[in-house]
Structures are given as structure tokens and as C-alpha cells.
Amino acid sequence: MVSLRRRRLLGLCCGPNGYVTPLPFLTAEEMITGIPNPNARAAYNPGPAETVTTVIVEKKAIEERSRRTRSKHMHFRSDYSDISPVNSDSISPKYQPPKRRKQHRRKRVHNQEPCLMRGVYYKNMKWQAAIKVEKKQIHLGTFSSQEEAARLYDRAAFMCGREPNFELSEEVIRELKQQSWEEFLNCTRRTITNKKPKSRIEHEDTKINASMPHQPEEEEQDSDKM
């Protein structure tokens, strides 16, 4: 509401006791936006008493809205200020790095062919054959080549009804059919233990021959003449 003094200063009143010209009616939308709407003014043209009451009601509604918005902003600020860095850390989930399993890789020697045979693995610079029976790993033997270890595994695989690496001959199949599993293991261990001393003896003989000096050809011819 504009005071009488302000209206006189603005030129709305004529003389000291002039008639106060009524202000034009403004709807709530016009009061908020500040843009006059001629359609709304033509549709609604109330009397002076109704105009005053509607303006008061609309002014109260605007004040109520502004008060609610201020209270919401104050409530939001208070809630935001109450959150400390410790609380924010406790609210946010703790970062846990993904667990990675260790990959056990076998050491490979230079110029070593990979283990492509079933039941064969490389350990202690030698090829070893093994088979798993009833959740137990049974060591069959140690060999210098991968093929020898695979051949022994094939015999054990035939006894257990598994797929071999190579095709077995009829003679070997006939021999294995006459043995039980325990007899096969005992026979295999016996052959491995019998092979060990021979290989050691041959290795020692080669060492002795290499250490002995060779006689020259002239001495050999003289000995033949005598």
C-alpha cells in the first residue's frame, strides 16, 4: 500500500485534500512477475472493498511462501554444517581393493619345451610322471625326457581307465590286463630302482675314462711288435 504522502509526491493526488486515485488491480502472478496481464484485469474487476481484501490475502500468501522458503534454506544449511569430515567418511563406504590370488608359475629353464602331456610336469631339472587316484597324488617316476614320463603315465592311465597321451600297443595292453593296480605300482618302482644303479655305474665309467690319459700311437705300435 502506498501512503498518501508518497502519492502526493508522485502526483497521484491533486491539491492538499485531493481524491486519492486507486491503484490498478494486480493479480498474484503480476505481483510476482511484475508484468501486467490485461486479460486477467478485464476478466476480474472487483469493487474497492474486495480489491483491498484480495491484495491483503495475496500479500499474506506471498509472505508465507517466502517464510517457508527461508526456513527450508536455513534447515538445509544447518544440516549441512553439522556434517563433519569424520561423519562424511563414516557414511561413505570404505574402499576395499579387489583381492587377487597369487599366480603360482613354474620356473622354466631356457630352451625347455612346455608340458603338453597329461600327467607330466617338470621339477628339479627333470621330467616327472604322476597320477591322481582317489584324491591322492601318486608319483610314478622321474625321467630325463618328457616322452618317457608320458609313456609311463599312459600305462597307469590305462590301469585307471583314463585317456592316455599315446596309443598303447596290443602287447603292452595284454601285459597290463594281467596285473592289478598294486602289482603295477610295485613293478614300476622295481624297474625304476633297478635302472638307477646302472645309470650311475655308466656315469662313473665315463668319468674314469675321461680322466685317464691316452697313450700315443707310437707306444701302441712298439708294444704290438714286442
From Swiss-Prot:
It is found in: Nucleus. GO terms for molecular function: DNA binding; DNA-binding transcription factor activity. Its main location: nucleus. Residues 217-226 have a biased composition (Acidic residues). One of its GO terms (cellular component) is nucleus. The keyword Transcription applies. Residues 105-171 bind DNA. InterPro entries: AP2/ERF_dom, AP2/ERF_dom_sf, DNA-bd_dom_sf. Residues 97-109 have a biased composition (Basic residues). CDD domains: AP2 (cd00018). Residues 63-109, 195-226 are annotated as: Disordered. GO terms for biological process: ethylene-activated signaling pathway. Keywords: Activator, DNA-binding, Ethylene signaling pathway, Nucleus, Transcription, Transcription regulation. Belongs to the AP2/ERF transcription factor family. Probably acts as a transcriptional activator. Binds to the GCC-box pathogenesis-related promoter element. May be involved in the regulation of gene expression by stress factors and by components of stress signal transduction pathways. This is Ethylene-responsive transcription factor-like protein At4g13040. It comes from Arabidopsis thaliana (Mouse-ear cress).
